Regions:
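Conserved donor-binding/catalytic core segment of Leloir-type glycosyltransferases
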Residues: 156-171
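Active-site and donor-binding regions of nucleotide-sugar-utilizing enzymes
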Residues: 1-153
C-alpha cells in the first residue's frame, strides 16, 4: 500500500507487477474508497477499502505488509487502539520508501520505532548512510534493491523534451 489517499507510489507499482506473477499468494492493495483511482485499480487486482472491516481482519493476519509509508497509523487499521493490538500483529513490515533518503531521519525510522523486516534503499550512499546514522538495523534488513516505480520507467529515445522537476527541498 501507499498512503490511504494516494495511488501513485511504489506500493502501486509493486502491486501491478505482483498481480502479473503466477504465485499462489493473496495480494491486496489498501486504498481509501473515495480515491479517484479506486475503481481503476480494482481492474488490476483486489483492492480493500482503507479502514474497512476486511482491512482490519487482513491487518491482523497478514504475513507481509508492504508499503511506501511505514507509519503504524497507515499500515495497521486499529487507529487509537494500536497499543492493544501490538502484540497480536506478527506481519513482516517491508518498507519500499517513496524516495531516496537525503537526511538522517533515524529518530523516526529507527528499529525501535518501526521494527522493519526489510528496508529497501536505492543507492550505495543511501545504504551506507543507514549504518552511519542510528537506525540500528542489521545488515540483512537493509536491502539495496531500488524503487519499483523506477523499474516501470520506459526509455523513449525519439522525444526531445526537457523535464523540470521542482522540489520542496532547500538544497
Amino acid at each position: 500500500m501507499d498512503r490511504p489517499n494516494e495511488s501513485d507510489d511504489n506500493g502501486l507499482h509493486l502491486f501491478k507487477y505482483s498481480v502479473q506473477q503466477n504465485e499462489p499468494i493473496d495480494k491486496y492493495f489498501i486504498l481509501d474508497s473515495k480515491n479517484r483511482d479506486y475503481d481503476e485499480i480494482k481492474k488490476i487486482g483486489k483492492v480493500i477499502p482503507y479502514k474497512s472491516l476486511k482491512h482490519r481482519f487482513l491487518g491482523l493476519y497478514a504475513e507481509n505488509i508492504i508499503t511506501s509509508h511505514p507509519d503504524n497509523g497507515i499500515i495497521y487499521p486499529f487507529w487509537g487502539g494500536y497499543p492493544y493490538f501490538a502484540g497480536l500483529l506478527k506481519s513482516n513490515n517491508i518498507f519500499l520508501q517513496h524516495g531516496i533518503l537525503k537526511d538522517d531521519i533515524s529518530d523516526w525510522l529507527n528499529k525501535k520505532n518501526m521494527n522493519l523486516s526489510f528496508f529497501l534503499v536505492s543507492s550505495e550512499k543511501e545504504y551506507v548512510s543507514i549504518f552511519r546514522h542510528h537506525y540500528n538495523y542489521d545488515e540483512q534488513v537493509i536491502q539495496l534493491k531500488g524503487l519499483p516505480r523506477y523499474d516501470n520507467l520506459q526509455n523513449v529515445e525519439d522525444k526531445h523534451e526537457i523535464i523540470i522537476m521542482p522540489s520542496w527541498r532547500r538544497y
